Amino acid sequence: MKKAFNILFWAVLGTSNLHAQSLQEAFKDYFRVGVSVNQWEVKAEKEIKEGISYSGAVSLDQTADYEQIAQHFGWVVPENCMKCEVIHPQEGVYDFTLADQLVDKALANGQQVIGHCLIWHSQCPPWFFVDEEGKQVSAEVLKKRMRDHIFTILGHFRGRIVGWDVVNEAFEDNGSLRRSKFYQILGEDFIPLAFQYAHEADPTIELYYNDYSMNKPSKVEGVVNFFRPLVAKGLPIHAIGMQGHMIYGDGDYVKQYTHSIKTIASIGLKSQFTELDLTMLPNPFGFSGANISDQAAYKKAMDPYQDGLPKEKQEQFDQFWLDFFQMLIDNKENVLRATFWCFNDAKSWKNDFPIKGRTDYATLWDRQSKAKPTVQKLIDMAESLEKKNKKEKKSNKK
């Protein structure tokens, strides 16, 4: 088995035209590098090996994909299979099938897993908030459902998952709390309650808050000001996640996120970038963020690169990530990890958001799962910094 893996490893390496070093190796002295994985990468591989016909969302060689994922990323995050509508579709009914496959696959490849996510207003089934008659439940009932949900899931994965996004997207872009069902029934207390329940269920794991548009000062300051007194009182939270769904030309992300990292650090918490991608396509309506309810109508002018990303645009894409990773390195004391959202362009959610049916190029691997030049350029940048640091250390010893 080991010999076969090594052969496949070098075969994949050759086809992707990369050196032996990977992204996770290149940046190991600065922060951790991960990627989100959907259940089809795992489910399809299992079915391919068992000779089962697969006709899922992705028609690629899933086994080869995951070898590259295992090579380059030390951490994986599930895209959807741990969200409430999938894992807890009915009261008292849990389905861990896909999530277990994903976790088992990651652990078998020496990777660690971050759970995503426990409490989120979206992709949460309606039953969570109503009784048998369809009436809104009381605060006490919702608390119990939250606690049962969190305890059951964390108990199931105890010892296999190192950290969880406990609460996801609870704030509006202006820094105010979102008026979700959780908020309507429990008020702002649902957030510290979720962290309390998670810590009680498994005190050994890291716990995170996660949100989009965290480059906006109003939002990051609203989030930080909310957590400041809670952290001072000992709330069990280890980091704040900033999703990082970015649009090329839509602002100075390096400057904005530098401010956000420092703002989060002011309350003693680390930052992590949890859902990184970059669209090179036109912005339909000055849109920013990741609110999945926001959609625009398809227009051909909004989908200009159906036959491939022009060389100039690819070079801009590459330089963006070089600048962004340099920013992460410059702030490495306060950055826990950087996680890319989706492995390749074919699987990226950005093809259908905020406009359905576009051809987007938001990830570091193309539609054939071949690494873009960006990957090697990032590795080269890290190697160059390492050589520079070694040279400076030698010079200081003289």
Stretches found by the model and what they are:
Residues 64-65, 69-72, 95-105, 149, ...:
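A general structural detector for well-ordered alpha-helical segments in enzyme core domains, enriched
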Residues 30-34, 75-77, 112-114, 161-165, ...:
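Structural preference for beta-strand elements that scaffold enzyme active sites
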Residues 21-90, 96-100:
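N-terminal pre-domain/capping segments
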Residues 25-30, 38-63, 181-298:
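Noncatalytic carbohydrate-binding groove/subsite architecture in carbohydrate-active enzymes
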Residues 128-147, 178, 217-233, 351-363:
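Short, electropositive alpha-helical surface patch
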Residues 40, 71-89, 98-215, 282-284:
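Substrate-binding cleft and catalytic face of glycoside hydrolase catalytic domains
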Residues 1-23, 390-398:
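Bacterial Sec-dependent N-terminal signal peptides
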Residues 156, 165, 169-188, 194-197, ...:
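Aromatic-rich peripheral "rim/lid" segments of glycoside hydrolase catalytic domains that contact
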